[in-house]
C-alpha cells in the first residue's frame, strides 16, 4: 500500500511538473510571437520616418521607398553580424533590468504596453521611437513587479546600461540638428557655383545613399532591441532549467533570433506607414533633395 502511495505521488508530481513546463513553454512562445509582432509594427511605424524625406522630395514613390528601406533594414543584420561582429545593442536591452526581477510576466506586460502605445501613435500619425517605448515598457513592468526601485539591496534597473540610453533620447535631436546644419552649410558652400538643375539631380541620387544609410541604422538599432527582449525571455526560461548564460552566449548559439528579428522589421517596413510619412515629410516642414540628404545623413550618423 505504501509503495502504491509513493507511486501515486510520483505520478502526480511528474504530471504537474510536466504540465507546468508545458505552460511555461507556451507562454514563452507567445512572448516570442508578440516580440516579433512588435518588431513588425516597428517596421511600418518607425521606418516611415526613414523614407519620409525621400518620398516628399519625389525621389522615390512610397512603394519604391518602403522596398528600398526594407532591403537595408535587413542588410543591417549582415553589418552587425559580420562587420561589427556582435549585437551590443541587444545586450544592453537584455541587461537593462537586473536578472532577479525578470520574469516572463514582466516581459509580456512590457510588450503589451509597447505595442498598444505604438498602435496609438501610428493611428494618430505621431512620430515616436518604438524601440525606446519597448525599453520603457520592459523597465516599467519590472518596477511594478518588484513594487519598489530596489529589493534586498539590488536595484531593479541596471542604471549603468539605461542612463546613457535615456540621455541620448534627449541629446539625439539636438546632435542631429547640429550635424544637419553643418552638412547643409558645407554642401551649400561647395556647390555654390553649380547649376541648380544639375545640383538638384546630384542631390536626388545622393538621397538614395543617405536614406539607405538611415535604414541601415534603423534596422541595426531597432531589430536588436527586439532581440534583447527575446533573449531576456529565453535566458529566463533556460535559468528555470538550471542553465545560466549571458545574452551574447545565447545569441551566438541561436542565430534564428537575429534572423527572425531583422526579417520581421523588414516585412513591417514593406507594409508602409503612410500616415507618418505624410507627417514627417510634409506637415513638419517641406524639404528639398539637399535638405533630405542632410537630414538623412545626420540621422544616420546620430
Set out the residue ranges of the language-model regions.
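Alpha-helical transmembrane segments and immediately membrane-proximal extracytoplasmic
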Residues: 3-302
Amino acid at each position: 500500500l505504501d509503495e502504491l502511495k509513493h507511486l501515486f505521488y510520483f505520478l502526480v508530481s511528474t504530471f504537474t511538473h510536466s504540465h507546468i513546463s508545458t505552460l511555461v513553454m507556451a507562454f514563452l512562445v507567445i512572448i516570442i510571437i508578440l516580440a516579433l509582432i512588435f518588431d513588425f509594427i516597428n517596421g511600418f511605424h518607425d521606418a516611415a520616418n526613414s523614407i519620409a524625406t525621400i518620398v516628399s522630395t519625389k525621389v522615390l514613390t512610397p512603394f519604391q521607398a518602403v522596398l528600398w528601406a526594407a532591403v537595408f533594414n535587413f542588410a543591417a543584420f549582415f553589418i552587425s553580424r559580420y562587420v561589427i561582429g556582435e549585437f551590443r545593442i541587444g545586450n544592453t536591452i537584455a541587461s537593462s533590468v537586473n536578472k532577479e526581477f525578470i520574469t516572463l510576466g514582466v516581459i509580456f506586460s512590457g510588450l503589451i504596453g509597447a505595442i498598444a502605445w505604438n498602435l496609438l501613435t501610428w493611428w494618430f500619425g505621431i512620430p515616436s521611437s518604438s524601440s525606446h517605448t519597448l525599453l520603457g515598457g520592459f523597465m516599467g513592468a519590472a518596477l511594478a513587479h518588484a513594487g519598489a526601485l530596489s529589493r534586498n539591496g539590488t536595484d531593479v534597473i541596471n542604471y549603468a546600461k539605461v542612463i546613457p540610453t535615456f540621455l541620448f533620447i534627449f541629446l539625439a535631436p539636438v546632435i542631429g540638428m547640429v550635424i544637419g546644419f553643418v552638412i547643409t552649410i558645407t554642401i551649400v558652400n561647395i556647390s555654390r557655383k553649380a547649376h541648380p538643375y544639375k545640383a538638384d539631380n546630384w542631390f536626388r541620387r545622393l538621397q538614395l545613399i543617405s536614406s539607405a544609410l538611415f535604414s541601415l541604422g534603423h534596422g541595426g538599432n531597432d531589430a536588436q532591441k527586439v532581440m534583447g527582449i527575446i533573449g531576456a525571455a529565453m535566458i529566463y526560461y533556460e535559468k528555470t532549467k538550471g542553465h545560466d548564460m549571458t545574452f551574447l552566449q545565447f545569441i551566438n548559439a541561436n542565430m534564428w533570433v537575429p534572423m527572425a528579428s531583422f526579417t520581421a522589421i523588414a516585412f513591417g517596413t514593406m507594409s508602409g506607414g503612410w500616415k507618418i510619412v505624410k507627417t514627417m515629410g510634409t506637415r513638419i516642414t517641406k524639404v528639398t533633395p539637399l535638405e533630405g540628404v542632410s537630414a538623412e545623413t545626420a540621422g544616420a550618423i546620430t
